[in-house]
Amino acid sequence: MIIFTDSAANLSPEKAAQLKVQVVPFHLTFMGKTYRDGVDIYPKDLYKLYTEYPNEFTTTSQPSVGDYVSLFEQHADEEILTISLSSGLSGAYSSAASAAHLLPNQKITVLDSRTVGPALGWIVEV
C-alpha cells in the first residue's frame, strides 16, 4: 500500500521519505508566480519573500484532479490510501475523490482527515 497526503500535512521531505509517503503539493501564487508547495518553494523561501515584499499576499489552491490522476496512475499496481486536508477547509479531498472516481480499476481510498497542519501529519504518521 502507498499513502498519499497533501502538502498541508507539513511533512518535511525527509519525514515523507522516511514514512514512504507521497506528498501532493498545493499551489501557491505570490506576485503572479505560481509555485508547487514543497517542490518549487519551501517555507524558508516564503518567509524570505514575505520579508522582502511585506505588502504582498499569497493565494493558495488545492491540487487539481489532474494532479491526483497523474500521481495515482504512476502507482496503478498498488493499493492507494489518500489522507487529505479537511474537506471543510479545502477542495483537496474533492479533487482526490474525483480522481479516484476517474480510475475505477485502481484500488484507491480517499480519507477526509477533518484536520490540517501538524495534526494531519500525525494522522499520516500513524
Language-model-detected regions and their locations in the chain:
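N-terminal glycine-rich anion-binding loop in soluble enzyme alpha/beta folds
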Residues: I2-S64
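Short beta-strand segments
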Residues: T5, T82-S86, D112
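Short, well-ordered coil/turn elements that cap or connect secondary structure elements
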Residues: Q18, D77, L103-N105
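Conserved beta-strand scaffold positions in the cores of enzyme catalytic domains, especially
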Residues: V23, T82, I108-V110
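Electropositive phosphate-/nucleotide-binding environments in soluble metabolic enzymes
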Residues: D40, T58, Q62-G66, S90-Y93, ...
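N-terminal glycine-rich phosphate/adenylate-binding segment common to multiple enzyme folds
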Residues: V65-A96
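Active-site histidine-anchored catalytic micro-motif
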Residues: L89-V126
